[in-house]
Amino acid sequence: MTQAKQSIPALYDFIKERQANPVAGSYTDYLFTKGLDKILKKVGEESTEVIVAAKNPDDPAFILEVAALTYHVLVLMVERGITVDQIATELASREGKKSRLQERSKIEKY
């Protein structure tokens, strides 16, 4: 397995830097210029594309779509002022907790 050259925290920092110092013509700058509604639209689109790609187990697009969704979620996090550390803290707070299925909404098969 090769080591990833781009970590999620590094990508987050890159996006945050682009927000602070826009580069004309960059896609990241475009998203921040268009604002929250455009960013939310892209997160929704990418989420749908992940779901569609996941339905086909042989679809190599799944990894591409998960990467695109991750990027757009990170843009959303920067826009909202949420850090990677905040997400890591929330995930850590859930570690080892028992799931109480009776408290969750039932997921129906579609």
UniProtKB/Swiss-Prot annotation:
Belongs to the PRA-PH family. Pfam families: PRA-PH. The keyword Cytoplasm applies. The gene is hisE. Pathway: Amino-acid biosynthesis; L-histidine biosynthesis; L-histidine from 5-phospho-alpha-D-ribose 1-diphosphate: step 2/9. One of its GO terms (cellular component) is cytoplasm. Its main location: cytoplasm. This is Phosphoribosyl-ATP pyrophosphatase. One of its GO terms (biological process) is L-histidine biosynthetic process. CDD domains: NTP-PPase_HisIE_like (cd11534). Keywords: Amino-acid biosynthesis, ATP-binding, Cytoplasm, Histidine biosynthesis, Hydrolase, Nucleotide-binding. SUPFAM superfamilies: all-alpha NTP pyrophosphatases (SSF101386). InterPro entries: HisE, PRib-ATP_PPHydrolase-like. It catalyses: 1-(5-phospho-beta-D-ribosyl)-ATP + H2O = 1-(5-phospho-beta-D-ribosyl)-5'-AMP + diphosphate + H(+). GO terms for molecular function: ATP binding; phosphoribosyl-ATP diphosphatase activity. The lineage of its organism: Bacteria, Bacillati, Bacillota, Bacilli, Lactobacillales. It comes from Lacticaseibacillus paracasei (strain ATCC 334 / BCRC 17002 / CCUG 31169 / CIP 107868 / KCTC 3260 / NRRL B-441) (Lactobacillus paracasei). Its EC number is 3.6.1.31. It is an enzyme of class 3 (hydrolase). It is found in: Cytoplasm.
